Amino acid sequence: MASNLSPAASASGASASPATRVKSATSTTSQFGYPRGHVGYLSADEEEALRSFQDVLEERGLYKRGPPASHDDQTLLRFLRARRWVVEDAFRQFKDTEDWRAANSIDTLYKTIQLDAYEQSRRLYPQWTGRRDRRGIPLYVFEIRTLDSKTISEYERLGSKSTFSQAKTDGKTPPGLLRLFALYENLTRFTQPFCTQLADREHPAVPITMSTNIVDIQGVGLTQFWNLKGHMQAASQLATAHYPETLDRIFIIGAPMFFSTVWGWIKRWFDPITVSKIFVLSAHEVKPTLEAFIDPCNIPKKYGGELDYTFGQLGVPDPHWEGVIDWEEGFTGFPTGPLLWEEVDDGKRVACVTYGSKGDEPRRQRICTLPKIWPATAAPEVDAENVAEGTATKTTSTAVTMTDVSEATQTAEPKAHDDGVQTDDAITNGDAVKKLQMHDEKHAEAANSAPPALATTVA
């Protein structure tokens, strides 16, 4: 399915059920992960931090207010969340990222990359299943065993010696890794904006800026982990530095007995916030935990769900897209390669357009269109005092109305290892969902303990 560049296989023949707003037990406004700290769900201090951040960036020539603004609020908020709302720290990371993007022509890389180079990267690294979790966040799967030392060596060799795009480089970022960042561009510029425009989610007025990830390490031996150490460390550190807060949770499946040794390396590649999002699940934890976050119809069969999806193939179209997406040119699913959304019909709809190059020919073909629902005409108002207490409440309804599905509430007393990783014995009696909920509440308490001066800027 993914080996050719023709339109993806057609969507499931099953009839589409009505779009409903589905709430998971771990995605309420009382918890730190989502949507707290996102557009429409900011406390007074967080609102002030965002305004101060915009002022600092504008004063230092890295931001223009527009309209349209040079950078949207949801992007700026990613850097603020990553740096715990300390504006000057967020500025330094933002500036480093902007400098890195300019020095490596990341926009040009994404728009001009050769399809075969893109496809080689796509097949090796985290892949969008075409589905979302219960909150509307895209679900990615990553099977580590595909990254053996021979494959990585060849991947880096071709990347360093081939002209796979029109982008320049800074000579510092390993050329063999640059293709990987076309995939991050696809996440932030295609998948997340697409999921933002889909209304069948719990908070349709909140733009999607994260991803949920299943990382499958079954069948990976200690030698393979060791051989991958350098490559994975470089890739992880660059991604953490320049694509902050694009991960919601990472569920590690199939961990071998020696994984605690491997974890000792891995946790040093990430900042503490990212580390806190990683959960290691034993075999009996996988199905109940994933189902708490993801509808079974969107979980691959390999992990106890109903989705006929195999790592390596293109994303499986969701029946809920029927009646929302208008496919064109014979397409019934999204093809491989760079994709971007562009406004059409006087801003009433958005169109998916292909980019990249096939041979010497640049691609530019319209795949589909769908209604533009975000940004909504009326943004939700939020009680800032309640947000600060972790109980945000909308006071104005959005333009989108959907059917509510009742929400479960659970509590539990967690155990945790000193190193912060959530492992089998940290999730007691198979009650992974309760453990995750308590983890979120603990995270929220830590965030609230930050000094009130966190929004103060440095001139």
Regions found by a protein language model. Name each.
Residues A2-A459:
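Basic, amphipathic alpha-helical/coil surface patches used to engage anionic, phosphate-bearing ligands
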